[in-house]
Amino acid sequence: MERTLTILKPDCVRKQLIGAVIDKIERAGFRVVAMKKTKLTAQTAGEFYAVHSQRPFYGELVEFMSSGPCVPMILEKENAVADFRTLIGATDPAEAAEGTIRNLFADSKGENIIHGSDSAENAQIEAGFFFSTEEAVRVNN
């Protein structure tokens, strides 16, 4: 089983879409391994998105991600990373395929509801940013 990390971003929480998005994720065959609601500071958001620090949108991204609560989750499924990227759709909801999470729920490229890891290696690193080893342990249920 492969794992990936997702974050339901502050716009998702603000629009009260947590349940609808999780329902779509679970119906696509993903199992939620770990989940929490948290609020990132500008510093922690900056650390998480440090890979984008030289990009023009970095400041806005950090500000947005620290603007309210978010919900990071570790998900599990065969081919989790690629399948989840397909499920969430393109970064810009206007370009996202019909029926994808961003197509259904996102308003803009900047506030696009959800983050998904782009590789298995990054998924592991990103999961470690939010969850301890104990929190991410496999639970049979």
Swiss-Prot record:
This is Nucleoside diphosphate kinase. The gene is ndk. It is found in: Cytoplasm. It comes from the Bacteria. The active site is at residue 115. GO terms for biological process: CTP biosynthetic process; GTP biosynthetic process; UTP biosynthetic process. Homotetramer. Coiled coil: none annotated.
